[in-house]
Swiss-Prot record:
It comes from Bordetella petrii (strain ATCC BAA-461 / DSM 12804 / CCUG 43448). The lineage of its organism: Bacteria, Pseudomonadati, Pseudomonadota, Betaproteobacteria, Burkholderiales. NCBIfam families: S18. GO terms for biological process: translation. GO terms for cellular component: cytosolic small ribosomal subunit. It comes from the Bacteria. This is Small ribosomal subunit protein bS18.
């Protein structure tokens, strides 16, 4: 077996990484929202990528209960042509 020498010491991620990310939190829980409305397009656009995909909860920090409501609201808004299914193909 090959021996590659001493292992490098692990550095602490939070202190030395210049791209430290904030802790994720659920916007809907913090605002006290009970139900997500499909007509609130400004909120829905924050959770849709430029190419039309819904951003997953592990990236946004949204709780599972609200992520399901968000998914349904985005799909309803798409069906009613309030939101596009995909990006603009100019």
């Amino acid at each position: 077996m090959a021996f590659f020498g001493k292992r490098k010491e692990k550095r602490k991620f939070t202190q030395q990484n210049p791209l430290f990310k904030r802790r994720k939190f659920c916007r809907f829980t913090a605002a006290g929202v009970e139900e997500i409305d499909y007509k609130d397009l400004d909120t829905l656009r924050d959770f849709v990528q430029e190419n039309g995909k819904i951003i997953p909860a592990r990236l946004t920090g949204t709780k599972a209960h609200y992520q399901r409501q968000l998914d349904t609201a985005i799909k309803r808004a798409r069906f009613l042509a309030l939101l596009p299914y995909t990006d603009n193909h100019n």
